[in-house]
């Protein structure tokens, strides 16, 4: 292998002696070269000010202008500078993470402001606020904001997703429910017996008093958990009914799950709302969870992010599910065990495709969750001991991740190189070349709009041997050094620096802007190769395209489709 240090020295020498710069290039060639644009080019260049020079995607531009100014008097504007202090001084806070250009955020704005006004008499209990996620990107990343608007409701600093309707009435109603007493009192054995016979799941706290600090913590925890009822009692006979020692130190708490082998789970952590809510969220689910559209939110929003998934066809489930369930008992509170019916077209097929699983063979897979989304496959026989060993190695970070990939293309001679998971190292991470990589999704409208422009960029730069222009289908391929942040994501990998994080392109998606970006960050200087002028003149004479073209049409703004 070529020495990396020698390569860096060589690159540094090239940089010191290079006299060319981006400003030396004749960029008019990139702007005004109408000769290579077909008359029917859907991405055709337009004159500035042309009535057609707008973005066709009204998802982002519709409704930008408001008929009337919005009174946001009661909406607090938060930033990284005041966010933590504001949450510390307000027990209940609803926060909208928005982007100024987002049409859905603009549509929400009047309802959100009206909801804040309606709730203003309860200012001592709740506040509505907003954060510009395009400015405070660290805050958005901290709270895993992946689309706009994202609305979170914080209780004692603990966030909970708001997934209700984006109307004033829905927001006000939802918040009022969160502010209402979330815990019910049990004072008699008869009341307790009704709970035991009538509810599949319940939380019971045994307290010295049904009011005070401990009761407040239980009430706050109940507001963080929608799917289970919370109860409190000071009656020792009720405690006995739930197998709690009435003489034991209070407060104490137990989770009832009638449908499970282990029907009672006792809590021994700090008596704080967030800790209690985490305990409930981690323990309310069964040992093995069947993935359906209804159960998906509770599975993937669970505080336990790491999962072991069993993919098996329906008629084989009776053989493998008991094995899977037995293995799961050793990892309660550490891992979620999830059963996926492989031949279920509604859920099984798309989930299997997401993880790159083909065929109908029974498969056990470990998944790290949405933060880094690494997958690991169990090799060998599916047995209790093998699954347990696999899960233990997963927790101890001893496994090698799997990354899905399409087959390497047999021919790859185009101006834009086709990258898949298996050949990214050879094409993009080649230390001797600068590389620009677009990660796209076939269904993404912004990717489709970018394609003609990106192809033109590849065509203009095809004669530069030190530079690679490439693209990869991010829905069918994965690589640890190419992680998309929405689609399209455009990443630049400078030569000699492939061990560093790639540089993300955030500018307008035009040939000129992408060219300037490459020129700025390229390790190996290059000069734009303009085609022969006589050939250009001949092509222009044959073209019906306008000769007075000023700018290439593109989305113009760095919009992305969500993952």
Curated annotation (Swiss-Prot):
It is an enzyme of class 5 (isomerase). One of its GO terms (cellular component) is endoplasmic reticulum. One of its GO terms (molecular function) is protein disulfide isomerase activity. Residues 46-180, 394-523 form the Thioredoxin domain. This is Protein disulfide isomerase-like 1-4. The keyword Endoplasmic reticulum applies. Belongs to the protein disulfide isomerase family. The gene is PDIL1-4. The active site is at residues 102, 105, 444, 447.
């Amino acid at each position: 292998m070529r020495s990396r240090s020698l390569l860096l020295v060589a690159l540094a020498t090239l940089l010191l002696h290079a006299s060319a710069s981006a400003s030396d290039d004749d960029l008019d060639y990139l702007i005004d070269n109408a000769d290579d644009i077909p008359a029917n080019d859907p991405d055709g260049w337009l004159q500035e000010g042309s009535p057609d020079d707008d973005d066709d995607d009204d998802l982002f531009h519709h409704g930008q202008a408001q008929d009337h100014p919005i009174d946001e008097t009661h909406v607090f504007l938060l930033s990284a500078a005041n966010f933590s202090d504001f949450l510390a001084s307000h027990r209940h806070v609803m926060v909208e993470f928005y982007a100024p250009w987002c049409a859905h955020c603009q549509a929400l704005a009047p309802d959100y402001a009206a909801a804040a006004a309606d709730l203003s008499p309860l200012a001592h209990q709740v506040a509505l606020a907003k954060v510009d996620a395009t400015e405070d990107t660290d805050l958005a990343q901290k709270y895993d904001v992946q689309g706009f608007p994202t609305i979170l409701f914080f209780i004692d600093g603990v966030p909970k997703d708001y997934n209700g309707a984006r109307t004033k009435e829905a927001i006000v109603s939802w918040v009022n429910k969160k502010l209402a007493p979330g815990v019910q009192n049990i004072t008699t054995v008869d009341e307790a017996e009704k709970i035991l016979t009538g509810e599949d799941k319940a939380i019971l706290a045994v307290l010295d008093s049904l009011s005070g600090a401990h009761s407040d913590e239980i009430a706050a925890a109940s507001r963080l958990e929608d799917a289970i009822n919370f109860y409190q009692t000071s009656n020792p006979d009720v405690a006995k009914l739930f197998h709690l020692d009435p003489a034991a130190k209070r407060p104490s708490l137990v989770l009832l799950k009638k449908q499970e082998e282990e029907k009672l789970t006792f809590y021994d952590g700090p008596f704080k709302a967030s800790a209690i809510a985490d305990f409930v969220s981690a323990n309310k689910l069964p040992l093995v969870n069947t993935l359906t559209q209804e159960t998906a939110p509770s599975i993937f929003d669970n505080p336990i992010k790491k999962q072991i998934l069993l993919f098996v066809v329906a008629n084989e489930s009776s053989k493998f599910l008991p094995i899977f369930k037995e293995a799961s008992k050793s990892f309660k509170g550490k891992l979620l065990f999830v059963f996926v019916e492989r031949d279920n077209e509604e859920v099984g097929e798309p989930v299997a495709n997401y993880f790159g699983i083909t065929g109908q063979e029974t498969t056990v897979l470990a998944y790290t969750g949405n933060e880094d989304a690494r997958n690991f496959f169990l090799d060998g026989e599916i047995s209790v001991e093998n699954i347990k060993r696999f899960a233990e190695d997963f927790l101890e970070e001893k496994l090698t991740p799997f990354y899905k990939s399409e087959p390497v293309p047999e021919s790859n001679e185009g101006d834009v190189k086709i990258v898949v998971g298996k050949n990214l190292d050879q094409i993009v991470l080649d230390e001797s070349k600068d590389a620009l990589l677009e990660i796209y999704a076939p269904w993404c409208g912004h990717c489709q709009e970018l394609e003609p422009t990106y192809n033109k960029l590849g065509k203009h730069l095809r004669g530069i041997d030190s530079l690679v222009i490439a693209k990869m289908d991010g829905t069918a391929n994965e690589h640890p050094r190419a992680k998309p942040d929405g689609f399209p994501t455009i990443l630049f990998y400078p030569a000699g620096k492939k061990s560093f994080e790639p540089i993300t392109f955030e500018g307008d998606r035009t040939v000129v802007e992408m060219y300037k970006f490459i020129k700025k960050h390229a390790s190996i200087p290059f000069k734009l190769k303009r085609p022969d002028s006589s050939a250009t003149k001949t092509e222009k004479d044959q073209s019906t395209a306008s000769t007075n073209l000023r700018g290439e049409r593109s989305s113009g703004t760095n919009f992305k489709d969500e993952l």
